[in-house]
């Protein structure tokens, strides 16, 4: 097995040749409007309108336009958020294809329809509230621009529904359940070795080693690196530092060779979540992580540039999505440096990419 060069300490790193909530904004600053309406028992139609005078090129990844069963809306019942059963994905944010965008002309609208029973546990039925807030990354150009230049903020109306439990129960879950009775390596996150080629297994083991080292280094740095903590998490309070240290240590334990393994990690996709652009994804309600082909082909083991995506921080990012590692599990509230650092303190603390970016910044001294 190809072994990556490493220093002896766990903090030493293997070196190689880098729908969501957003900060509250006045309505006049929003470039888009989103209205939710019900078209069936649990079927939701989102109407997205460009309020401006210029065309918008809207990135679909991890937004209400996403074709994957990601978290497009928040669903509440009796003041408590309903269990999410879909996927949380990390997307490749460089060299974006025009196919990943939806172009919306001035004052024009587009509709997106999805069934919330496919990604939420609505088997109890009853009254629920559905809403969406977040940002949609926008690109410059007239229909084919792919360089992200801004973010369109939105906050939808609140939609009240009375769900028929029998009808909701008849809707198939988008991601289903995974049979975990397979060959595994058990002394950390459980790698499903039956899903791995030799080269994939070596890459994943290296990424887990680096994820542990990055996370441990971040945990140790957080109490001293208050400027960097403030940059990514907007607070240096005692509770914030305590939470960061605890969560990074938990990721390090789950990633390292001496853990009991509370998650299961697959080298390849068995749940059909690896659509174009997906690096890896997590099923948070099952504590399962899946790597996609471009995780191996398009990412270096470790980044050499600040805020660049790599295998190690992608694995770290996915670890924070698992409720067995971080509770409550982190969501995808802001992607990349610009979006992640625009979040509020409470949002950043629950944003998976904020942890990946902070760990990268500590490692490279960004």
Swiss-Prot record:
Belongs to the peptidase M35 family. One of its GO terms (cellular component) is extracellular region. GO terms for molecular function: metal ion binding; metalloendopeptidase activity. One of its GO terms (biological process) is proteolysis. Keywords: Cleavage on pair of basic residues, Disulfide bond, Hydrolase, Metal-binding, Metalloprotease, Protease, Secreted, Signal, Virulence, Zinc, Zymogen. Its cofactor is Zn(2+). Secreted metalloproteinase that allows assimilation of proteinaceous substrates. Shows high activities on basic nuclear substrates such as histone and protamine. May be involved in virulence. The keyword Protease applies. Disulfide bonds join 196-267, 274-292. Binds 1 zinc ion per subunit. It is found in: Secreted. Residues 1-19 form the signal peptide. It catalyses: Preferential cleavage of bonds with hydrophobic residues in P1'. Also 3-Asn-|-Gln-4 and 8-Gly-|-Ser-9 bonds in insulin B chain. Zn(2+) binds at residues 317, 321, 332. Coiled coil: none annotated. Its main location: secreted. Its EC number is 3.4.24.39. Residues 20-188 form a propeptide. This is Neutral protease 2 homolog MGYG_04094. The active site is at 318. It holds the Pfam family Peptidase_M35. The keyword Disulfide bond applies.
């Amino acid at each position: 097995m190809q072994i990556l060069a490493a220093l002896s300490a766990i903090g030493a790193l293997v070196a190689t040749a880098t729908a969501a909530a957003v900060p509250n904004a006045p309505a006049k600053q929003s470039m888009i409007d989103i209205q939710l309406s019900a078209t069936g028992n649990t079927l939701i139609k989102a109407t997205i309108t460009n309020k401006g005078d210029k065309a918008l090129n809207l990135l679909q990844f991890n937004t209400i336009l996403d074709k994957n069963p990601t978290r497009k809306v928040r669903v509440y019942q009796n003041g408590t958020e309903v269990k999410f059963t879909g996927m949380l994905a990390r997307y490749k944010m460089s060299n974006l294809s025009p196919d990943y965008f939806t172009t919306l002309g001035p004052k024009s609208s587009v509709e997106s329809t999805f069934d919330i029973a496919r990604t939420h546990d609505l088997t109890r039925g009853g009254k629920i509230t559905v809403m969406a807030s977040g940002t949609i990354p926008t690109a410059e150009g007239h229909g084919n621009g792919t360089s992200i230049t801004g973010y369109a903020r939105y906050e939808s109306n609140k939609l009240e529904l009375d769900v028929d439990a029998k009808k909701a129960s008849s809707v198939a879950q988008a991601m289903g359940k995974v049979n975990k009775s397979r060959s595994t390596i058990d002394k950390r996150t459980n790698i499903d070795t039956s899903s791995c080629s030799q080269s994939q297994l070596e890459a994943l083991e290296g990424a887990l080693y680096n994820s542990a080292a990055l996370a441990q280094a971040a945990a140790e740095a957080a109490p001293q690196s208050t400027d960097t903590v403030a940059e990514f998490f907007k607070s240096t309070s005692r509770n914030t530092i305590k939470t960061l240290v605890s969560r990074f240590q938990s990721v390090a334990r789950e990633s390292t060779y001496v853990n009991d393994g509370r998650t299961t990690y697959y080298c390849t996709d068995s749940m059909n979540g690896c659509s174009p652009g997906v690096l890896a994804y997590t099923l948070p309600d099952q504590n399962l992580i899946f790597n996609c082909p471009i995780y191996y082909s398009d990412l270096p083991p470790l980044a050499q540039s600040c805020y660049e995506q790599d295998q190690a921080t992608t694995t770290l990012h996915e670890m924070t999505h698992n409720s067995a590692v971080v509770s409550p599990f982190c969501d995808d509230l802001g992607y990349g440096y610009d979006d992640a650092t625009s979040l509020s303190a409470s949002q950043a603390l629950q944003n998976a990419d904020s942890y990946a970016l902070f760990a990268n910044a500590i490692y490279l001294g960004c």
